[in-house]
Amino acid sequence: MAKKKSTISPLYVHDKPKSTISEKFRGIRSNIMFSNAENEIKSLLITSEKSASGKSILSANIAVTYAQAGYKTLIIDGDMRKPTQHYIFDLPNNSGLSNLIINKTTYSDSIKETRVENLNVLTAGPTPPNPSELIASSKFATIFNELLNHYDFIVIDTPPINTVTDAQVYARIVKNCVLVIDAEKNNKSEVKKAKGLLTKAGGKVLGAVLNKMPIDKNSSYYYYYGED
């Protein structure tokens, strides 16, 4: 099993389902579901403008909310540079997305069950020397489309978009995006840059989540829509 990082927050929605923050996560899920009235959203890219914004914890908890709602859900750790989901779910990471793209493993060996019903995790796998090139390959597009046919909903946790190009490459395929912003430490120009990069790549920014927002003492997540 994965050695846990002491800084990793719990799966609030699963472990503390009646907490205020769990309700906030469910509210975010509802906003995502109703953000596109014409077409059902089946996949979601979650990124941030910088590191340490809380995107991985958000990704995990959003995935749990979909699983709890009865959706057969998969969370993909798309951050092959600094993977986190295997720590959050306490899973091995010897086999995952990176191996799958280069045909060194199978779906059954890479996709792991979790303690959450209806939720599987595709961990990042060993860090490759060329993450962006692997993501841009036709093999990844094939993998993603095959997984869409197998799951009701897919969440992809990606690296910060202003740091490396990985999230832009994912956005070309996944399309629907949510940007996580640190409410305490952010730069308006960097946030605009992040949104611009997602849009330029072909992504549709559904909205943003302000993390560390002091709404009340029990909650730190707030979802909003907006063009600016």
From Swiss-Prot:
Keywords: ATP-binding, Capsule biogenesis/degradation, Exopolysaccharide synthesis, Kinase, Nucleotide-binding, Transferase, Tyrosine-protein kinase. Gene3D superfamilies: P-loop containing nucleotide triphosphate hydrolases (3.40.50.300). Its EC number is 2.7.10.2. One of its GO terms (molecular function) is ATP binding. It catalyses: L-tyrosyl-[protein] + ATP = O-phospho-L-tyrosyl-[protein] + ADP + H(+). SUPFAM superfamilies: P-loop containing nucleoside triphosphate hydrolases (SSF52540). It is an enzyme of class 2 (transferase). Pathway: Capsule biogenesis; capsule polysaccharide biosynthesis. One of its GO terms (cellular component) is plasma membrane. One of its GO terms (biological process) is capsule polysaccharide biosynthetic process. Required for the biosynthesis of type 1 capsular polysaccharide. NCBIfam families: eps_fam. Belongs to the CpsD/CapB family. This is Putative tyrosine-protein kinase CapB. The lineage of its organism: Bacteria, Bacillati, Bacillota, Bacilli, Bacillales. The gene is capB.
